[in-house]
């Protein structure tokens, strides 16, 4: 990749399926063969996001994608504030002053509320470890839920998810 002009490598795990130890092993292997920065992007959909980032950081990843907590977690990336605090006082300290983030977080809490109200959005309210079985990216989960809700069928969300492995197999 480098000899073809790549300036960095981005690993995108949009469904949050990458396990912490798989991330560790992948990053370690890549760092042995590449000198360009490596970025990891994962989601918290199945509850592994923060742990995956911690193991990737330990393995030497250069960049992790996060989102401020009003837009983070669940089907999004780990929260910026949480990762900053988790890495504080370690050899991986980001040197980000988390206290400077709070006013920004407060602002985006209001922005999120306005977006939810304006677009009548319902966001999933908890992680779903079974996502590893369904293999659906976080954005698609939110979209699927809102489509079902628009049809008055949000109560069938779990049933639709359970059918996904069958659809994948049939295709």
Protein language model features and the residues they cover:
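Catalytic cores and adjacent flexible loops of soluble metabolic enzymes
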Residues: 1-171
